[in-house]
Amino acid sequence: YVLRSGTYAAVVGGVNVDIGGQSYAPLVARDSNPGRVRISLGGVGRNIAHNMSLLGVDVRLLTAFGDDLHAQRVAASCGELGIDISHALQVPGGTTSTYLFLNDVDGDMALGLSDMDICERITPAYLASNLSLLNNAQVIVADTNIPAESLQYLVTHCTPPVFVDPVSTAKARKVQPVL
C-alpha cells in the first residue's frame, strides 16, 4: 500500500463557458430572433470540482484554458470556490472551451455548437509534469473530454483510485480500453 501525503482530490477534465439562448417566439431562420441569453460556467471537470468543493473536499483541478476573458471568469470562480487551479495549463492565444446552444420557444434545443479543442492540450506529457501531484491525491476523478491517451496515462501511471465520468455515449468509448 502506498501512503499518500495529500488530503485532496485531483480532478482532470474540461472547463467550459456555456452560452445559451432561448427564443421568445418560433425561430425564424437567417434572422435575428428576440429572446434571452444566459452565460454560465460548466465543463464536466469543473462541475465535478465545484460539487466536491461544496462538499468540503480540497480539490486540485488539472485542466486547460485560454488567456481570454472566459479564462478570467473561470479562474475567479474557482478561486471563490476554493478550487486550486495553480497547476492548470493556460494556453497563450488559446480559446477557453465554449459551448453555445440555442433553444426554440418550447425549450427544445435547435442548435448546439461546441468549441472544446483546448481539451486536447491535457496530454500525457502535461499529466506527467504533474505526476507527483496526482499520485499524492487521495482520489483522481477524470472526464472523457480529455484525450484517450491521457486516460490511459492516468490508469497506468497513477496510484490513487481513478474514477471516470464518461460525459456522453460517444465519449464513453474512450473508457473501454482502460477498464
Show which residues each predicted segment covers.
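Short, glycine-/polar-rich solvent-exposed loops and beta-turns at beta-strand/coil boundaries
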Residues: 92-94
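Short alpha-helix plus adjacent loop in nuclease-associated cores
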Residues: 96-99
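Glycine-rich phosphate/adenosyl-contacting loop at the front of the ribokinase-like
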Residues: 1-62, 69-83
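Ribokinase/PfkB-type carbohydrate-kinase core domain
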Residues: 1-15, 60, 77-90, 101-179
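Residues in the short beta-alpha loop(s) of Rossmann-like NAD(P)-binding domains
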Residues: 65-68, 168
